[in-house]
């Protein structure tokens, strides 16, 4: 709501926000209103399926592979350090210093996020995708996602290239969205 109200989707009718954290949440906005869906799960992107094994009927979801918490777990495994000593900040710092293993963790996230965004673009076709939460503070995130979108598009040119940006309010978008919701309720 904050991004539609005063942020990166201010002049847009439709938007998808994606926030990485313990899971992967977000929102689906259509005609400037949040779409909740019949079962109130629209925007719960954690459950989107990425991959699986048909022989054992096992699936891997978006959150398991790409949530910030999952990236930090991979970081701890690669560095053979306790999970409590790891963080997203350390992951990004090591990647920016040239640590190839940390760059691979980030690239895997960018790649799978690009695929999910392209799938959602094909189904829903919003004006813009906005990446929020703490991860959006890192410019390399939007650059990485857009790089993979371009590479995938080169292989599948029928896909529409979506607009992907960082949330204006980054990690505070949820707080400002709650304020907007409160003000809207108060006016009514």
Model segments located where?
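ATP-binding/phosphotransfer module of carbohydrate and carboxylate kinases, centering on a glycine-rich
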Residues: 5-11, 50-188
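Acidic/histidine-rich catalytic cores of soluble enzymes
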Residues: 1
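Glycine-rich phosphate-binding loop of actin/hexokinase-like ATP-binding domains
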Residues: 9-66
